[in-house]
Amino acid sequence: MAPSVTIDNSSDFSPITTNFKTTSFNPRTLLLAPPSIASHEEKLRNVLATHDRTVTDLQMLDRLSAGLVTLPESTYDLVLILTDADGTRVESKGLLTRDVFGKITQALKAGAKLQAQDGTFGQEIDGAEYQEAILSGLVAEGGVMLKPDYSASVAVPLRLRRKDNSKNAAVSSAGPAVSMAAVPLHGKRKSVDMTDDVPEKDVPKVDSPKNDAPKGVGFIDFSDDFDAEDDDDELIDEDTLLTEEDMKKPLAIPPECAPRAGKRRRACKDCTCGLAEKLAKEDADKRATADSQLQALKLDADDLAEVDFTVQGKVGSCGNCSLGDAFRCDGCPYIGMPAFKPGEEVRLLNNDVQL
C-alpha cells in the first residue's frame, strides 16, 4: 500500500497583525531620536525600556526632517524628543525646522504634549524652538508645550423670538383682524363676508390716507428757493483774518523748498510757501531784460551793409534764382527772399528786405 501524503496549503509566513486602539488608558507615545543615538544601542535600549512598546513608536528625527517618513494625524498623546549621544540636544535642535514642527503638531492629539528628554524644550521664551512651536499652533502651559483642545468650546445657539401664530386670526394690512374662512376650490365661489364674525362695535374706524403715494417715493417742495443763501450760515471774510502786521511778515519757506545750488527747484502744484510767485517774478524779470536788450540793438542808415545777391550776367545752375521760391531749387541760397531782378541792389533794414 502506497504511503499517503498530506499537503498544507496555508502560508507559513503570514504576519500576525495586532491593532492597538488608542484609548484614555493606553496613551500612545512617539519617540524622536537624533541620528547620533542610533550608534549607541545601549542608550536606545535604556530609553525603550521605560516605555510600553505596544503603544510606543520610534522615529528618526533626520528621516522625518528629510520627508522620508510620515506621521499619522491626531494619534499621539506625547511626543518625546530624545537627547543626543553626548547628553545634549545640539543635533536635534538643528533638525527641528518649521516643517518638522508642523508635522509633529498634526500628529499630536488635542491636549497632547511635546517635551524633551532633558526637560529643556520650550523653557527659553526668546529661543528659536519656542517661537517655532508657537507658530506651529502649540501653546505653553505648565512648562510644557500643548496642542490646544478647540473641541472644548461650545457653540451657544441664538434664539429669536417668534410671533405666536396659534390664533386662527389673520391681520389685514388695511384693516383690523378678521377671522379665517374656508373657500371651496370647486364649483361656484360663495361670497364670504369677512366681517360676519366681528361685531360692529369692535371694528375700529380706519381713516383713509390723504395721499395715495407709493411707498419709498419722496416729494420735493419746489417752492423752496435752493439758490438763496441761508441766513443761518455765517460767512467769514478771509481778508479780515490777516492784519497789516501779518502781511508784512516774510513767508516761512520750508527747508525742502529753499533754493539750492545747481539745478533750480520747481514749485509744487499747489504751492503755498511763495516759491511759485518768486520763480514767476524771476522769469518775468529775465524776459523784460532780454526784451530791453533787443530793443536797444538798432542799426542806423550809415551802419547798414549793402548786400548784392547777384552779379550782372551771372546766373545759377537752374537759372531761376530771381524768379521766387516757386521756381528755385532746394539748395538755392535765395530761399525765402522775394523775387528780384538780376543786378538789383537789396538792403536789409531792421530784418526787413528792402528792394
Swiss-Prot record:
Gene Ontology cellular-component terms listed: mitochondrial intermembrane space
Region (Fe-S binding site A): 257-273
MF-aspect GO terms: 2 iron, 2 sulfur cluster binding; 4 iron, 4 sulfur cluster binding; electron transfer activity; metal ion binding
Region of interest (N-terminal SAM-like domain), ranges: 23-156
Basic and acidic residues bias locations: 190-213
InterPro entries from the UniProt entry: Anamorsin, CIAPIN1, Dre2_N
Protein origin, superkingdom: Eukaryota
Residues annotated for [2Fe-2S] cluster binding in this entry: C257, C268, C271, C273
Region span, Fe-S binding site B: 318-332
Short motif Cx2C motif 2, span: 329-332
Subcellular location: Cytoplasm; Mitochondrion intermembrane space
Positions of the UniProt region annotated as Linker: 157-247
Recorded domain comment: The C-terminal domain binds 2 Fe-S clusters but is otherwise mostly in an intrinsically disordered conformation.
Quaternary assembly: Monomer. Interacts with TAH18. Interacts with MIA40.
UniProt similarity note: Belongs to the anamorsin family.
Protein name in UniProt: Fe-S cluster assembly protein DRE2
